[in-house]
Amino acid sequence: MTIPKKIWFLWYQGLSEAPLVVKKCYESWQQYNPDWEVIFLDENNLTDYITPALPKEKLCQLSKTLQSDLIRVELLSKYGGVWADATSLCRVPLDGWLEEYTQAGLFAFIYKTRSHGWIFSWFLATEQSNPIIVKMQLTFVAFFRDNEFYHNGRIAKKRIAFLKLFLNRKYKTTKFWSSWIVRKIFKVYPYFIFHFIFANVINSDKELLKLYKTMKPYYNTGDMLGKYGLLRPLTAEIKERIDSRIDPVYKLSWKYKQENYSPSCILYYLLEE
């Protein structure tokens, strides 16, 4: 399948106000993909590409993370291309690996097992109007448009903590996070609602599930450095892995203690060397 050569990259405050990690990540997509159009989005130019599907009063209630989730599915549904989170670092040109994994017209790194439909959302690639991403966009928008939620605060936290005891026990029970009783009675949703709804979209439609299963799985390795701690000392083992470029993309974080950022740490090697 043909993925349009567009890379979508969002930082609301603009590039000049972005932290070092975000600036370096943006530069990495430009450096390794000179034949791709890298589109930097911020709050000033976002409406040049999409009109938010949610009413303003609903959209303003959502966290920036959820707004970003809505933006990515709207952009990919309308234009296709690659969504790269602002803290995702490109290490291998997209032309060198992505096409092999886009038989479904969509690609995402897989979380543990493909059968459950769980994906990572920080890197997504789709063709324009891909049926899976279109259905996801419609479903995700409707979830927030057609329901009234406690978006934060003590009530929401208590209810979510209670529901987690039952709904997070197994993969299969997570589908009930978007059920009528949770939406209309408890009026809350968990942090990973995007991922749970995506899995529901896949598993509730035979044709979409069939299409999804044609996507060659690539089990996520991009956040493997996180388990070591990005500010920990760079060992020979980690350096060898980074230098091998076996991982095409890394998921980083811009939230770290500046005093711990030094030439001996993993993050410094990724960004500066």
Model-derived features: positions:
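Small-residue hinge/turn detector
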Residues: 69-81
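Glycosyltransferase-associated regions of secretory-pathway enzymes
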Residues: 1-68, 84-273
